[in-house]
Amino acid sequence: MAIMGVQMVVTLLVASIMQRVSPHYSFGRWLLCNGSLFRFKHPTEEELRTLAGKQKPKAKRERRTNGVTDEKPLTVPKDIDLRLDTQPITTIDALVLRYFLEYQWFIDFALYSTIIYLFTEAYYCVVDAQNEINIGVLWCLMSIIFSIKVLFTVMKHYFRSEEGGERSVCLTFAFFFLLIAMIVMVVRDEYLEFGLEPGLASVCHNLENFLAQRGWQWSMPFVKLAFKIALVALCAFLGGCLTFPGLRLAQTHLDALKMAADRPMLQLLLHMSFLPPVIVVVLWIRPITRDFLLNAPMGKESVELMSNSAYNTFRLWIIVVLCLLRFCLTRFHLQAYLCLADRWVEQMKREAGRISMLEIQRKISRIFCYLTVVALQYLAPIVLTFHCVLMLKSLGDYSWGLYPEPTGFTPVVDSSPVQSHSPTSEEEEDTEDVQAAVEQIMGAMSSLRGLFTPLFFRGLFSFLTWWVSVCQIVTSLFGLYFHQYLGAS
């Protein structure tokens, strides 16, 4: 409390509200159950028999009397005139969905972490709290970790599949992204302006001084190599986790465009929501964006359209707006997925042969049961990108451009020992113990701030934001090609 101050009070208050309010009102549950999404109900056996012109089967006792003992699955022709009934999704319906509780908790946590981050931004604007720990950053970091965890949980579901095709797809894309990450690591900052090398050099310099003051020695080239290997491994892991979200996004994008065939404005918004990863990737290609805006050719002269700091602010706002745009179109993508049931029935009608009633019911019900999986695949990359940008702004000492902010600074590692005074009484001894503990905690945090500089965080979170967009571009473009050409054939 003495260390965190007002931010700790607000954090505890928000955590308490989240625990008490979520069972009664949940933003994640509202996204699915606000009445805007409707599901297709599977037909009953009576309805299928009526459409097929069949009578109700005899009871078991009558079949035994007539000498019929084998029970064959009830089948109907595929070309029956089957029309599915629709029903708005309710909370009772959502409780049977797979991973519904994980989805609800994840969306609610992302919302509350964003609220706390906005509060800390306002708090830092009003109060000079540079020496306090930014609680909003910790919440954003947890949102990033939970986003990756959710994506990994969904990927594990594909690995448990009996067929094994999904597992091969994830491993193939993970290896492919591993190669791309290794290539990106050797690209110079003149082309991809992450700033990883300067940031890593500053960390190694501070770490070398920190260890030298304590009589330790460590090979700094080994630290750089280990960090790059770990980052490449993380890139491959993220690529594998984002494989099926990208493929699913391509499918729902195409289906949503077909649903909005008579709504050109909605089609324009859908196309705009599909392009954000491309725009994010281009924003970090220096010759195309920063160099052009800082030295725009105007005839024989070059004009500076914006400064370096203005471009950094502009880039942050562009990514935030693109994330919000994609989030606002969540309903259309989820409804496009739910309409797969009706589309599957229409495709079945064009086929010849017979199909069991149970298979029809199972296929239609399965599409609805995996709604929350599709929602997680759509929303988790948005949450991941959004909170990476928030971390980039706060830890990278950038500005939103809305209010004057203090310039960032790089703390110097202070290894001076804590001065101790001789106690004169038991009360003074207890007081000094508490003060010593607080000073040790503050010293440890100051050391960490001194090691990991804003320059390092700029490089790290710029790269992570850019890499998530690269994974989405590759997988979604492959998904478009697959669903338009390979899947259709």
From Swiss-Prot:
Q: Which organism is it from?
A: Xenopus tropicalis
Protein name (Swiss-Prot/TrEMBL): Transmembrane protein 161A
Superkingdom of the source species: Eukaryota
Signal peptide (UniProt feature, chain positions): 1-23
Per the UniProt record, one Pfam family is Tmemb_161AB
What does the record list as coiled-coil region(s)? none
The UniProt keywords, alphabetically, are: Glycoprotein, Membrane, Signal, Transmembrane, Transmembrane helix
Give the region (Disordered) as residue ranges. Answer: 51-70, 413-432
Question: Can you cite an annotated GO cellular component?
Answer: membrane
Q: How does it sit in the membrane?
A: Multi-pass membrane protein
As for family, the record states: Belongs to the TMEM161 family.
- Just give the chief location class: membrane
Say if the entry is tagged with keyword Signal.
yes
- Compartmental location: Membrane
Give glycosylation sites per the record: 34
Q: Which residues lie on this side of the membrane: Extracellular?
A: 24-98, 156-166, 246-264, 326-366, 481-489
Described purpose of this protein according to its UniProt entry:
May play a role in protection against oxidative stress.
Statement: the UniProt record of this protein carries the keyword Cell membrane: no
Topology Cytoplasmic: residue spans: 120-134, 188-224, 286-304, 388-459
Q: Where are the transmembrane segments?
A: 99-119, 135-155, 167-187, 225-245, 265-285, 305-325, 367-387, 460-480
What gene is this protein translated from? tmem161
